[in-house]
């Protein structure tokens, strides 16, 4: 039988090494941040109650990878030293558990994961869930580090962030100690916390800057060596992936995605080496994937507003004022049999789309009589947006 599958091309030695969830054997180019982290958590291995830590930096700059490495190192070190209490770390991603209540349930269930206890279900009162969490922490009779990744998604209240650091002072736990490690892409989250929570959660702050091209080359060299068969990459591929990612967001994730996608391009072409042309093709694919993912996260009307700017850009009528855009938007909403939102809401959507990197906002000030207003233009490729919205069509629009 003839099937659509290609013969296997042996470019990957271990494809998993280029997947996002892969935990690197070694952390590269983050010595300074690791030192700061070690200083912040030194008290744990010295037998004192640890400080809480707030880690921030843009997406893909190694916050999660370094935190996991630090937690492993801490657990290892505490095991290795005489007279030091055991260390348990537990990680929850607040993107998937966006309220204090949900995050607390997830933490209890993570902690119960390696015991015989049944998982908690929803329907319990907040104080029952919190008490279950204190019980789990107390049962460890040691130091428990609670890692809250993407902590800025905790959108309801500060309950968990207020209660956890005070658990010992308030007598909720006695034989254990607890510290919170909060990780965020968004520094403004810190400033929006109530002063009491800010003081405790941000006792130690560690900033992760974007990577430069040289640092990304080191990270990619390391990954490529483990992921790919030898001789697969031609000379310029890694520097090119590194330079493109450094110029854009300085994200290791973006650089690794580019490398993986470049290899895929060569494999689909049934070639045995990857070239710089493959990187060019990969850039468009990765960008399209990124746009598609972010578009999926927009509300339906957010997508209509983006489509309105896109159509205006294709007609070569951008930068455009919100007022002029409104009619295009209203027509699109009508096409989808949806009542248009108010002008004010469309303004808010334009603002959000600018913050998310879809649009560029220009502040026009024509002085007395001319007025002050914003104009918008597309900051991503129009064709890519159209393709992505067409793909998302079935699911959302
Ligand atoms: N210094 C590094 N050495 C090796 N690999 C790294 C390094 N920094 C990041 N990576 C890899 O890059 C990818 C993204 O890193 P990570 O998830 O830690 O970023 P992040 O800052 O937590 O991003 P986000 O805020 O989006 O979660 C992962 O695959 C990670 O293994």
Curated annotation (Swiss-Prot):
Keywords: ATP-binding, DNA replication, Nucleotide-binding
GO molecular function, one term: ATP hydrolysis activity
HAMAP family hit by this protein: ORC1_type_DNA_replic_protein (MF_01407)
Database matches in Pfam families: AAA_16, Cdc6_C, Cdc6_lid
Description of the deletion phenotype: Not essential for normal growth.
Record InterPro entries: AAA+_ATPase, AAA_16, Cdc6_C, Cdc6_lid, ORC1/CDC6, Orc1/Cdc6_arc, P-loop_NTPase, WH-like_DNA-bd_sf
UniProt record, GO biological process: DNA replication
Record's keyword annotation contains Protein biosynthesis: no
Entry protein name: ORC1-type DNA replication protein 8
The keyword Nucleotide-binding is annotated on this UniProt entry: yes
First and last residue of the signal peptide: none
Gene that this polypeptide is encoded by: orc8
Domain of life: Archaea
Binding-site residues, ATP: 61-65, 211, 223
């Amino acid at each position: 039988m003839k099937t659509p599958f290609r013969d296997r091309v042996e470019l990957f030695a271990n494809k998993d090494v280029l997947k996002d969830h892969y935990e690197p054997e070694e952390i590269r180019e983050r010595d300074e941040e690791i030192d700061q982290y070690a200083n912040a958590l030194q008290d744990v291995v010295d037998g004192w109650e640890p400080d809480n830590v707030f880690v921030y930096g843009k997406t893909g700059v190694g916050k999660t990878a370094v935190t996991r490495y630090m937690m492993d190192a801490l657990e290892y070190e505490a095991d290795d030293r005489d007279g030091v209490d055991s260390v348990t770390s537990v990680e929850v991603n607040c993107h998937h558990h966006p309220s204090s209540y949900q995050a607390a349930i997830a933490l209890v269930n993570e902690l119960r994961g390696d015991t015989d206890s049944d998982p908690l279900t929803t329907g319990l009162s907040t104080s029952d869930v919190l008490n279950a969490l204190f019980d789990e922490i107390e049962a460890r009779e040691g130091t428990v580090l609670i890692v809250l990744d993407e902590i800025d998604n905790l959108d309801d209240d500060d309950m968990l962030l207020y209660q956890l650091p005070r658990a010992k002072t308030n007598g909720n736990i006695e034989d254990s100690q607890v510290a919170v490690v909060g990780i965020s892409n968004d520094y403004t989250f810190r400033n929006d916390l109530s002063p009491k929570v800010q003081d405790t959660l941000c006792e130690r702050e560690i900033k992760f800057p974007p990577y430069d091209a040289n640092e990304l080359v080191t990270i990619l060299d390391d990954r490529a060596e483990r992921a790919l068969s030898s001789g697969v990459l031609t000379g310029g591929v890694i520097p090119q992936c590194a330079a493109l990612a450094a110029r854009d967001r300085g994200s290791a994730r973006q650089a690794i995605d580019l490398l993986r996608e470049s290899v895929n391009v060569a494999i689909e072409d049934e070639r045995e080496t990857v070239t710089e042309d493959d990187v060019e093709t990969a850039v468009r694919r990765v960008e399209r994937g990124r746009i598609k993912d972010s578009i999926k996260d927009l509300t339906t009307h957010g997508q209509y507003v983006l489509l309105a700017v896109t159509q205006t850009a294709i007609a070569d009528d951008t930068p455009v004022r919100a007022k002029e855009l409104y009619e295009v938007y209203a027509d699109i909403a009508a096409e989808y049999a949806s009542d248009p939102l108010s002008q004010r809401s469309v303004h808010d959507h334009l603002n959000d789309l600018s913050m998310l990197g879809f649009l560029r906002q220009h502040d026009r000030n024509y002085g007395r009589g001319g007025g002050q207003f914003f104009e918008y233009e597309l900051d991503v490729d129009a064709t890519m947006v159209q393709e992505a919205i067409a793909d998302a069509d079935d699911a959302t629009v």
